Amino acid sequence: KAMAADLQQSIAIQKALDDTKGFLAVTFNYSGYPMVRVLRRHVQEGTFGELKQIQIEFHSDGFIQAPEKMHPQAWRLVDGAIPTILLDLAVHVQHLSEFITGQIPLSVNADFHHFSIFDGIVDDAYLWAKFEKGMRASYWVSKTALGHRNGLRVRLFGEQASAEWYQEEPERLHIYGKDSVRMTYDRGNCYFKEEVRERFKPGHPAGFVEAFANLYNDIADALVMFRKKGQFQSPYVFGWQHAHDGLVMLDAAVQSNKTETWVEIN
């Protein structure tokens, strides 16, 4: 999940990396999905024009079933300085937002909730973010959304087009243009085919395990480069700085929830 539970742990990890000159790659596996990578390329190639907003939802109903049916792991039922649901889910949401748009949040507002029978934890949260270029973001993470299993959904809106990707249909990327033009791309007919690393031909869905496999393959390439040059560059492999920045954003969200105000991300 998250690289660390709080900023102090993250800084300790950085010190260990500096002392050992070590290699660190954090498993942000959702950007391993082929069509998420294709969406990123559409952003880079200007398909959407100026980006206006991104909405990401990541919700399930694991904490709102009948008591006898719920058996959550113990670590999910304890909140630290940063609520576990943020470390579990929102860390991936923040990563995807930056991965897809290339933009860094400047400030955050947050509203945390508790709806389940499990006392003392946050099990539902909204986060909103502002960005330097005027883009806005809306994030929702929840363990108490009845009817949803692991409903990761990304919606992106620009001045020229919008897009939607849903994890339960990972093969499809929907892009909507002006004049009601709607296009659906999959691994067999998408632009930027070089972004699609696949083990099965189109029609054989590349799901969750394949997304991990894509990332691990990229990490292996990055490790080979690191061993040769002492550093690595990869558009898909993220180390300490990216993971730490995500924790900084989540820490600011905690402060925002307490003060009920926008908090700048330093």
What are these regions (language model features)?
Residues 29, 126, 131, 155, ...:
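C-terminal glycine/acidic-rich active-site capping loop/insertion
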Residues 10-14, 19, 180, 218-266:
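C-terminal helix-rich "cap/oligomerization" subdomain common to oxidoreductases
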